[in-house]
Amino acid sequence: KKEIKAVSDKFNKPILFTEFGYRSVDFSGREPWKSDRYNTSANLIAQNNTTTALFETFWKEDWFSGGFIWKWFHNYETSGGELNNQFTPQNKPVEEIIKDYYLTY
């Protein structure tokens, strides 16, 4: 967090995460960019926890501008769901967490 704030201070610009999100798998916060764990069951609590941690860490900072959710699909009705272990928050409990933070801040 200190390093990110330092970049904001150095350039006198707010920080915007152009992409953020976590898979709904065990240890979703460990190397979250890796997507090679396809044969694992969904862990919706892990996705909730990692997403909440991101919001709690950055969302209230005045130097933070927000971010864009990875991975949001245009076909909402058929995307995600509680058995889906991929990045999308659609039709999963984490979607409500995201809505709450975007509404509040």
Task: Describe each model-derived feature in a short phrase.
Residues 27-39, 44-53, 57-105:
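Aromatic-rich peripheral "rim/lid" segments of glycoside hydrolase catalytic domains that contact
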